[in-house]
Amino acid sequence: MDMDQQRFAGIARLYGQQGLQRLNAAHVAVVGIGGVGSWVAEALARSAVGEISLFDLDDVCITNTNRQIHALTGAVGRPKVEVMAERIRAINPDCVVHAVADFVTRETMTACITEAMDCVVDCIDSVPAKAALIAWCKRRKIPIITTGGAGGQIDPTQIRVADLNKTFNDPLAARVRSTLRSDYGFSRTQGRNYSVPCVFSTEQLRYPQADGSVCQTKGFVGEGVKLDCAGGFGAVMMVTASFGMVA
């Protein structure tokens, strides 16, 4: 058995040789290479997926250290997609990796997401971009799985998968649903399947306060607390990585 066969022999023993061949032939896009998406990309690479497209315009920031697999000291300031692509190639030199340093938006969708992709994993944290991507894939019958918000949570055992129209306790998923209904004509009927699997958590969110404490009620978030990357929801990799593994 040569090195290439040895690398994924464990995958073949789990899914069978035909299953391994299907993984080798698959092309998966990961949109958003952050706290969830970086772990998705890692899992795909280690599962013998033969072609992976990575989309993100952000650079690695030192504040990513707590939750993103590519956030190493030497990577700070470099494009996330480039760092992740190097990591994937180190895992599997035979994997074809497309590192696209751009955000997937309504305007860039045509150039980024095509029917040649077997699956798209949405790990974006922008509501308009998430909704645009989901609508685009649904209309073109490209399989897509989306992820809700992974910040403000500490218990990975509360992660679930449900249809996007049936999630709860997830403000990000709720806002995406609202946008899909208002801008893309998705059904307003509560509980009707969108046929879009969504990874989300049932856990009550923990909101940061200005005095350094946390609370579980948004209404008590102190003034001056901006829920952004630098000072918003806290996050821990055991949750963000679990979101990625479930996706």
Where are these regions (language model features)?
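Conserved SAM/SAH-binding loop
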Residues: V100-M109
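Conserved N-terminal Rossmann-fold NAD(P)-binding element of oxidoreductases
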Residues: V30-G32, F55
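Glycine-rich phosphate/adenylate-binding loop
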Residues: D2-D4, E115-M117, I124-A129, I144, ...
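Glycine-rich phosphate-binding loop and adjoining beta1-alpha1-beta2 segment
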Residues: V49-N92
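N-terminal charged helix/coil linker that caps or initiates catalytic domains
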Residues: M1-A29
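Acidic/polar active-site rim loop that often engages polyanionic ligands
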Residues: T63-H70, Q153-L164
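Hydrophobic/small residue at the entry helix of a nucleotide-binding pocket
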Residues: V36
